[in-house]
Amino acid sequence: MAVQPTRIGLAGLAVMGQNLALNIAEKGFPISVYNRTTSKVDETVERAKKEGNLPLYGFHDPESFVKSIQKPRVIIMLVKAGSPVDQTIKTLSAYLEKGDCIVDGGNEWYENTERREKAVAENGFLYLGMGVSGGEEGARNGPSMMPGGSYEAYKNIEDIVLKVAAQVRDSGPCVTYIGKGGSGNFVKMVHNGIEYGDMQLIAEAYDVLKSVGKLSNEELHSVFSDWNKGELESFLVEITADIFGIKDDKGDGHLVDKVLDKTGMKGTGKWTVQQAAELSVPAPTIESSLDARFLSGLKDERVQAAKVFKAGGFGDILTDQKVDKKQLVDDVRKALYASKICSYAQGMNLIRAKSIEKGWGLKLGELARIWKGGCIIRAIFLDRIKQAYDRNAELANLLVDPEFAKEIIERQSAWRRVVCLAINSGISTPGMSASLAYFDSYRRERLPANLVQAQRDYFGAHTYERTDVEGSFHTEWFKIARQSKI
């Protein structure tokens, strides 16, 4: 038990909570911790002792936990989103006082954060919704943090988060005050949506290299390790290289080949796609990555479908195509990078659309800066995004930034070769294909949408605009078409 009041408290000691608490303590801030399951409290206290006698103090009941923290109190919650958050707030509120601050560090739906901020304000409490990215390793050694809500609440923890967040040599701590309301949770949600896209694109690169190029796991390990030294340098490419190098400890071969091809999810990707639809922001790369996870979940159905089509002469790979491995690796690298630009462009445009709708005033370049370290999507590429928004804060789309436009033009031939090769081989590349379609649609001055609008006017009298005259028009297409047939 702490003799002096601690600087901060943390409730919820699953992996993320434990590691963040230890990180805070290691940075010199005495911390009180609490969990409903008391064994987790004892486990965390024991870890603190083993990891350097850190100033971390455990409590088995909420009252003594709250009262151990210096005023105005700051308590971070890291519990499952939804009703567990409401229950934790209710439990803690019984002992909090006016001016105390609650910080939700989980992946919460942004409107829940806004609701809770208003609700606790009635008791005089402050509230923050703070996205935390980086997984268990990031939480322990320095995550990217996205706090939004009460600015006064943020100032109460600013000294802590500036030290606890990941530190990037050329751009500082990976944390900033995001904005009002649920902006912090919304930004973290879209971060996760971009993460879905990134992971899917990397998986497709792997599939093409393995299924068409016949690269071994050793070769894949080498390729991804090389990629991580260039424009694709990132956490996800780094861990992908690691994965290909790990042997199975329960049998022969590599572990990656024994992992069931069925991807789980926790909901933030789905939320991102739903918000994109609600705001009419095209996000096909992120959407396709979500659909890919849904399809992966249909494992039993896919097993049966494979039998049906194999009986009809369709194997996993339609044709074995002779390819130049070196050329293929280079083409796939370029296709992955170009697709990645599209995925980030979609995510940034979604954040901007929500910021405009809610009046948050979010700075997209600053978001790219705090994602450069600690988080799952951290990448050297984010420096380029920050520079793009520094050049033009009103940039309509990353695709039309002069530097990114030049890079896409240089890579688009390789991008098309990879997508065509995959299609001809019967390999699905939904992320790369969707990214390419997004690019081709966005760069074309005229799309076939004129025909779709004409059809809508034909059957529903929805009217249309003309290219040569201002105004709204309706044509009796059916009547004219029938008269012309007489």
Curated annotation (Swiss-Prot):
Q: Which UniProt keywords apply?
A: Cytoplasm, Gluconate utilization, NADP, Oxidoreductase, Pentose shunt, Peroxisome
TM stretches of this protein:
none
Q: Which GO terms describe its molecular function?
A: NADP binding; phosphogluconate dehydrogenase (decarboxylating) activity
Please give the knockout or disruption phenotype noted for this protein: Embryonic lethality when homozygous. Defects in pollen tube growth.
Q: What class of enzyme is it?
A: oxidoreductase
State where substrate binds.
N107, S133, G134, G135, H191, N192, Y196, K266, R293, R456, H462
Pfam families in the record: 6PGD, NAD_binding_2
The active site lies at: K188, E195
Q: Where does NADP(+) bind?
A: G12, L13, A14, V15, M16, G17, N35, R36, T37, V79, K80, A81, N107
Subcellular localization(s) per the UniProt record: Cytoplasm, Cytosol; Peroxisome
* InterPro entries, per the entry: 6-PGluconate_DH-like_C_sf (IPR008927), 6PGD_dom2 (IPR013328), 6PGDH_C (IPR006114), 6PGDH_Gnd/GntZ (IPR006113), 6PGDH_NADP-bd (IPR006115), NAD(P)-bd_dom_sf (IPR036291), Pgluconate_DH (IPR006183)
Q: What is its EC number?
A: 1.1.1.44
One GO-annotated biological process of the protein:
pentose-phosphate shunt
Q: Name one GO cellular component term.
A: secretory vesicle
UniProt record similarity statement: Belongs to the 6-phosphogluconate dehydrogenase family.
According to its UniProt entry, the function of this protein is described as:
Catalyzes the oxidative decarboxylation of 6-phosphogluconate to ribulose 5-phosphate and CO(2), with concomitant reduction of NADP to NADPH. Required for guided growth of the male gametophytes and interaction between the pollen tube and the ovule.
PANTHER family membership: 6-PHOSPHOGLUCONATE DEHYDROGENASE
NCBIfam families found in the cross-reference section: gnd, PRK09287.1
* Name listed for the protein in its UniProt record: 6-phosphogluconate dehydrogenase, decarboxylating 2
Q: What is the protein's species of origin? A: Arabidopsis thaliana (Mouse-ear cress)
Q: The organism's lineage?
A: Eukaryota, Viridiplantae, Streptophyta, Embryophyta, Tracheophyta
The gene that this protein is the product of is: PGD2
